[in-house]
């Protein structure tokens, strides 16, 4: 494995363990050239998914692009990278389970919003403000009102009615 610091092509594995989701292996490595440590992830090479954009363009699904969008929405929020990785893992798993080679970007956006709403309201609103392309402040306020209403309904539910975190 090539070192990201010095480019040396040999490293040794210090620690190896499956990720929480069990779909990849996390390896802690040490470069044999500069002795710096870095982490790699090994995962099964699955068939590629194609994302169909709103304008009809098609492009390959990139989990890193999805993760970056989540990181941006959760910037300066108390949300760990591990939780965001778990969300991306869950969304990717759900997309692959559809057995459809092409997935509409709107479907992916709705999956993200559903999970962010449960995870962090501020991150949800940030993501929604970009994803939903609100026409004006009034439509944005309507979305906030809907979010608050959904949360109030959740608080009114009885024991066991709460939604579990993904």
UniProtKB/Swiss-Prot annotation:
Q: What does the record give as cofactor?
A: Zn(2+)
* InterPro entries xref list: ATP-cone_dom, NrdR-like_N, RNR_NrdR-like
Q: Does the keyword Transcription belong to this entry?
A: yes
Q: Which UniProt keywords apply?
A: ATP-binding, DNA-binding, Metal-binding, Nucleotide-binding, Repressor, Transcription, Transcription regulation, Zinc, Zinc-finger
| Residues of the ATP-cone domain | 49-139
PROSITE patterns the UniProt entry points to:
ATP_CONE
Family under the similarity heading:
Belongs to the NrdR family.
HAMAP family xref list: NrdR (MF_00440)
What is the name listed in the Swiss-Prot or TrEMBL entry for this protein?
A: Transcriptional repressor NrdR
Organism expressing this protein natively: Pelotomaculum thermopropionicum (strain DSM 13744 / JCM 10971 / SI)
